[in-house]
Amino acid sequence: LPRRRRRPARLILFLRFMENEYQIEQYVEGMSVLTDVYDKMCSYEDLEISYREARKGKRYRPEILKFSDKLETGLDLLLFELNEQVYEMGRYRMFYVHEPKLRLVMSIPFRDRIVQWSIYRYLFPFYDKQFIEDSYACRKDKGSHAAADKLQYWLRQAHRKELENPDKKCYYLKLDISKYFYRVNHEILLDILRVRIHDEKMMTLLERIINNPNQKFGLPAGFSPEDCPYEDWLDDTGMPIGNLTSQMFANIYLDQLDQFCKHTLGISHYIRYMDDVIILSESKEELHRWKDCIERFLNECLALSLNNKTAIRPITLGIDFVGYKIWATHRKLKKSTARKIIRKVKVICYQLSIGEMTKDEFKRRAASYHGILIHCNSHGLCTELNRIYCSYVKTLEQNGIGLSQVVVPEPKETKTEVQTVECHRNNRPPLRSCEDASRDHQQAGIVHSGDECGG
């Protein structure tokens, strides 16, 4: 007899509207669980693999060189602590980053990163199979560009329907969770993890990481990291930005929202990148109803709330998502992102012109911006970046002045936000042949635009 096809295993945390009240219920069907994963993780070979993963891209940092100098001793000590269940997290090093906005990043010692890589290597592949298809953050073969492509594919479908029937309009609901990483409830997160992880040793280790007694991660409502005194921080909420386990927990936590929207509300055009959610529909009323259901689900089940960026608009206005402004017909960088790229290109051009940056390093930096620009319609921005490059570097070389002999005053735009400059024909550099401009730009790693040479 043919084998009976097993129904897909899934765990759905959903709400049912009964007597004007929401009730949380767990629906378990053929659920797969993890057992004895802690003992498998606690081996010298596994820690050595995790060590190699943790040092990728930063192996020459002093902290990592110091640990690598006595690698066997360090891994043996770590293995002993894990086997005896006496492992404790080290102290966090805290600092602020300002891109894309002010964030408090918490960095852990390198030995703790090895442990987190061991946890990640066993837990994330298991949970990744349960996630919905249209969750794109911190997943293999996903990412921001894939998310932008999928959303634009949906917009093109909606645009074709509007062309066939002009009376049908399509709208989008943009959901943005307020201070997501600072508001994740520890008890709810641990309850979600316990459903699938049936290993007490692993749960004890995860609880030590989540409920770290030496560090607070949560912010009270209405506060930002920079204006909240440390004594007012909360110890029962929040996750440290910068931890590998934090991005994994963030996806697991909001997977409950994904399952609720897809299986309970029946939303087909739903896409999420970390805490940014976009939903498409032909009915404004339907979007408002979904928004109310989602907001109540977040408040009562996940102890989260939406911020004032949440909005319902026509898709013809474009959608801000993963750093781009996306339409059905084209895609542009957000204005704030374009201003930041212009500002950074001015800085690296200035550093190259005075000899503070090598050409190889300049090419690497320029290639990273090129990687962003090739995924959107950026003809005007490429022209402006090429103009900046010529004004800072090529002018000096054409005048026969060595880069190390000249000090160019640092532009004011490096300290303040600059406005996007339109490249008018009357302030372009002198026309050159297309071949000369293309060759110079390729050598420097800058995207060549035919406008600069008159082509």
Task: Report each predicted region and the residues it spans.
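Short, conserved non-catalytic motifs in the polymerase core
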Residues: 3, 57-65, 90-116, 130-143, ...
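Non-catalytic, polymerase-adjacent accessory regions of viral genome-replication enzymes
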Residues: 2-76, 405-415, 421, 432, ...
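Intrinsic-disorder-associated, low-complexity terminal segments enriched in Asp/Asn/His/Tyr and depleted
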Residues: 424-427, 440-441, 448
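Right-hand nucleic-acid polymerase module
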Residues: 19-23, 108, 117, 226-235, ...
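Active-site-flanking structural segment that lines cofactor/substrate pockets
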Residues: 72-102
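Helical (often loop-to-helix) elements that flank the catalytic cores of nucleotide-handling enzymes
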Residues: 283-305, 332-335
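Active-site-proximal segment of RNA-dependent polymerases
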Residues: 15-17, 21, 27, 35-37, ...
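Conserved polymerase palm-domain catalytic core
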Residues: 74, 81-82, 154, 158-274, ...
